[in-house]
């Protein structure tokens, strides 16, 4: 059996906000170091680090390797950076589980990191030289993170098409986003995230600043949500508020087997019951989590109503709405502390972040079974089922 010994994350900073002076490896290092320490392990106990990062341009070689070494792990620890777009962090956990099952590793730190604030602009054709005419500057964040590779259409346009197809109104999506924001504000104000967040110390000319709570929920103005202009279509229903926020952050989980945990005297938080990937046409990425959840439910033998809590990443409000409607879920069990519409969506981290949040939410509420799922650009989705120990 695969178990999760510890699970932490940094706070999420807004775009060009509180964490914008930190690189992705800087943030990843903070999460890795704390996860290992909380697990009661020594840095030398970790066999490998598998970390997601979607926007690596300009970060130099091996972002996961950089984060691992900054975290104080020895040079003998392997490190792999993976890119499955929004699913990178969750896929890292899945690959960690696979490696442990295969016997190629005993203890793995898995997770993800992103500094969307520091994603560079790229000079196309600069290597060959600009002989004549106009050149082009490409936004690394947009091209690699937020646009369909084949069509160049933004994820928002494709999401808007699905929202239109499913008949989701502006009012329905705004109502969902407002609910998410209210939940997030309540969670921040009541300290619900304290158990999962590791503080990040940011140095500035004015001295060190400790960032230990998500930046965006308390800055949002709920009364302005209904007044925002459509973001992707003149008469569209998706806005900046009922879509996820561009942000920075990292998350890390210590993954091992039940046997190794027992041998080392570790106290696991949860067991990994099942995980799955679902893939379909790229334009249908927003509904792909429904298929991933179906696969996980089949593997576990659980019924949807048996699941105590759900984390469905709110890349757009309508993604979570599709999952809720697809399985007739109780909305009070979905993203109980708010989701990406309110908290943020640092691409490489979100997949692991929602697992971290799910574990701690189950602990706080006395639940046991949980499922986390998220959509992925390119028409994919991943889902994972966990059960507290």
Region locations from a protein language model:
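Conserved catalytic cysteine-centered active-site region
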Residues: 53-107, 149-154, 219-245, 326-353, ...
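Short, well-ordered amphipathic alpha-helical segments that serve as non-catalytic structural scaffolds
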Residues: 24-40, 63-67, 92, 155-162, ...
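Active-site-proximal alpha-helical scaffold in enzymes
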Residues: 82-114, 163-192, 252-259, 324, ...
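Conserved beta-ketoacyl condensing-enzyme motif
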Residues: 20-108, 112-131, 197-211, 284, ...
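Condensing-enzyme catalytic core mediating Claisen C-C bond formation in acyl metabolism
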Residues: 1-22, 137, 220-287, 291, ...
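Active-site pocket-lining segment
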Residues: 157-160, 196, 203-204, 273-342
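Flexible glycine-/small-residue-enriched beta->alpha junction loops
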Residues: 107-161
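N-terminal extracellular/periplasmic Venus flytrap/periplasmic-binding protein-like
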Residues: 9-10, 21-30, 38, 172-263, ...
């Amino acid at each position: 059996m695969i178990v999760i010994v510890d699970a932490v994350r940094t706070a999420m900073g807004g775009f060009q906000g509180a964490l914008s002076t930190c690189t992705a490896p800087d943030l990843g290092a903070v999460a890795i170091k704390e996860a290992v320490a909380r697990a009661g392990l020594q840095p030398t106990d970790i066999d490998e680090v598998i970390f997601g990062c979607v926007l690596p341009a300009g970060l130099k070689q091996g972002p996961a390797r950089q984060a691992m070494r900054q975290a104080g792990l020895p040079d003998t620890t392997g490190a792999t950076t993976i890119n499955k777009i929004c699913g990178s962090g969750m896929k890292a956990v899945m690959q960690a589980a696979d490696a442990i099952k295969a016997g190629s590793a005993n203890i793995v730190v898995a997770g993800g990191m992103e500094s969307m604030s520091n994603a560079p602009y790229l000079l196309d054709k600069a290597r060959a030289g600009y002989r004549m005419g106009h050149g082009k500057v490409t936004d690394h964040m947009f091209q690699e993170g937020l646009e369909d590779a084949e069509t160049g259409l933004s994820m928002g346009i494709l999401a808007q098409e699905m929202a239109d197809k499913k008949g989701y109104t502006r009012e329905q999506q705004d109502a969902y986003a407002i609910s998410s924001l209210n939940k997030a504000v309540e969670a921040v104000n009541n300290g619900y995230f304290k158990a999962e967040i590791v503080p990040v110390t940011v140095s500035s000319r004015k001295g060190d600043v400790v960032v230990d709570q998500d930046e965006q929920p308390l800055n949002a103005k709920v009364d302005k949500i209904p007044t925002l202009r459509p973001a992707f279509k003149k008469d569209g229903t998706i806005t900046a508020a009922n879509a996820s926020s561009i942000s920075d952050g990292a998350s890390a989980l210590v993954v091992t087997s039940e046997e190794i945990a027992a041998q080392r005297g570790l106290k696991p938080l949860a067991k990994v019951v099942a995980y799955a990937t679902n893939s379909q046409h790229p334009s249908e990425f927003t509904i792909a989590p429904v298929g991933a959840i179906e696969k996980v439910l089949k593997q576990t033998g659980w019924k949807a109503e048996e699941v105590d809590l759900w984390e469905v990443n709110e890349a757009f409000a309508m993604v979570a709405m599709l999952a809720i409607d697809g399985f007739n879920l109780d909305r009070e069990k979905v993203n109980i502390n708010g989701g990406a519409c309110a908290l943020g969506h640092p691409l490489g981290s979100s997949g692991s972040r929602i697992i971290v949040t799910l574990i701690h939410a189950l602990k706080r509420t006395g639940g046991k079974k949980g499922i986390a799922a998220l959509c992925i650009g390119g028409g994919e989705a991943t889902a994972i089922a966990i059960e507290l120990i």
